[in-house]
């Protein structure tokens, strides 16, 4: 009896007439009268919702359509490879998406399949090949041992030093003459040039050390004035705090318009629970986008427009 594992995409199996015709076509090619099929959906096998028995099937059928994704192909090809017997074939039927044609061939090879045909695809699991042990000879040939012995017999003597006394004295004189040609680097620079370099490179004694933020009281390098100018500019650019008294009222409408209050999160109209800590609408009740809201809190009525939301 021939056992067949069938994997089909849900869309392919939904067309019952097409699915039955494809199964009958592949069954007609089988020479075995008795036939057993196990049918599974691709998405369930790829999602590990169902499993396949290892080495349990004589052949495999794979029905794909354009809805099949590359992730599903990567997941099912190794599982089909393990489910069929060594030497079994996997026939593929259906229409591929254009970008999956080359990907299917690559993933088939990575899963271990051999590609027998590409139109349509027919894959085959390679048959198992038993390993044959090889006996390695440990005997040494006579020529090899003789060669080793001859190598020691005809070893070349080491080269000895044959320099005469005259050559040694001549080399010593040349070395002394070469030392006389060296120059003292300190002699190349005068004392005035050395003192000038120290004055240029040394920082002023009254200046602060690098990285120190606080300047000296008697700073003469201009850093103190520069820091004061930067601090004054920063304080001028900072918004001034509004001071309120018991008899003073503030118009929220003018404040919101002067600051160009614009909602960046889009949730300001929902109320304080949905507003960030820096929201210009903090303290105001919820309102509808674009709606004019009037509030009375025992003082003059305040109004504003939420057109910027």
From Swiss-Prot:
Pfam families per record: CIAPIN1, DRE2_N
Region (Linker): 133-195
Taxonomic superkingdom: Eukaryota
Cofactor(s) needed for function: [2Fe-2S] cluster; [4Fe-4S] cluster
Sequence motif Cx2C motif 2, location on chain: 276-279
Keywords: 2Fe-2S, 4Fe-4S, Cytoplasm, Iron, Iron-sulfur, Metal-binding, Mitochondrion
Residues binding [2Fe-2S] cluster, per UniProt: 207, 216, 219, 221
GO CC annotation terms, alphabetical: cytoplasm; mitochondrial intermembrane space
Annotated region described as Fe-S binding site B, given as residue ranges: 265-279
Binding positions ([4Fe-4S] cluster): 265, 268, 276, 279
Main location: cytoplasm
InterPro entries per the UniProt record, alphabetical: Anamorsin, CIAPIN1, Dre2_N
GO BP terms, alphabetized: iron-sulfur cluster assembly
Listed HAMAP family: Anamorsin
Recorded domain comment: The C-terminal domain binds 2 Fe-S clusters but is otherwise mostly in an intrinsically disordered conformation.
Primary role: Component of the cytosolic iron-sulfur (Fe-S) protein assembly (CIA) machinery required for the maturation of extramitochondrial Fe-S proteins. Part of an electron transfer chain functioning in an early step of cytosolic Fe-S biogenesis, facilitating the de novo assembly of a [4Fe-4S] cluster on the scaffold complex CFD1-NBP35. Electrons are transferred to DRE2 from NADPH via the FAD- and FMN-containing protein TAH18.
PANTHER family found in the cross-reference section: ANAMORSIN
Family stated for the protein in its record: Belongs to the anamorsin family.
Protein name, entry field: Fe-S cluster assembly protein dre2
Species annotation: Schizosaccharomyces japonicus (strain yFS275 / FY16936) (Fission yeast)
Protein encoded by which gene: dre2
């Amino acid at each position: 009896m021939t056992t067949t594992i069938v994997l089909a995409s849900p869309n392919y199996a939904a067309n019952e007439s097409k699915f039955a015709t494809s199964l009958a076509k592949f069954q007609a090619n089988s020479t075995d009268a008795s036939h057993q099929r196990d049918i599974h959906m691709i998405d369930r096998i790829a999602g590990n919702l169902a499993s396949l028995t290892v080495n349990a099937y004589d052949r495999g059928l794979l029905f794909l359509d354009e809805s099949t994704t590359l992730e599903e192909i990567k997941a099912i090809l190794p599982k089909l490879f393990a489910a069929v017997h060594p030497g079994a074939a996997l026939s593929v039927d259906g229409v591929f998406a254009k970008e999956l044609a080359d990907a299917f061939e690559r993933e088939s090879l990575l899963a271990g399949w051999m590609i027998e045909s590409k139109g349509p695809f027919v894959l085959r699991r390679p048959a198992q090949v038993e390993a044959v042990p090889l006996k390695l000879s440990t005997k040494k040939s006579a020529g090899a041992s003789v060669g080793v012995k001859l190598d020691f017999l005809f070893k070349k003597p080491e080269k000895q030093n044959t320099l005469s006394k005259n050559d040694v004295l001549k080399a010593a004189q040349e070395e002394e003459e070469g030392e006389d040609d060296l120059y003292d680097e300190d002699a190349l620079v005068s004392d005035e040039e050395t003192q000038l370099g120290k004055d240029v490179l040394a920082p002023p004694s009254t200046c602060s050390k690098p990285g120190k933020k606080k300047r000296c009281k008697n700073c003469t390098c201009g850093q103190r004035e520069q820091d004061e100018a930067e601090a004054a500019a920063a304080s001028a650019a900072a918004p001034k705090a509004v001071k309120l008294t018991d008899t003073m009222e503030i118009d929220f409408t003018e404040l919101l318009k002067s600051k160009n209050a614009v909602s960046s999160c889009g949730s300001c109209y929902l109320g304080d629970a949905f507003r960030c800590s820096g929201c210009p609408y903090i303290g105001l009740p919820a309102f509808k986008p674009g709606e004019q809201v009037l509030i009375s809190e025992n003082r003059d009525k305040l109004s504003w427009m939420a057109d910027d939301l």
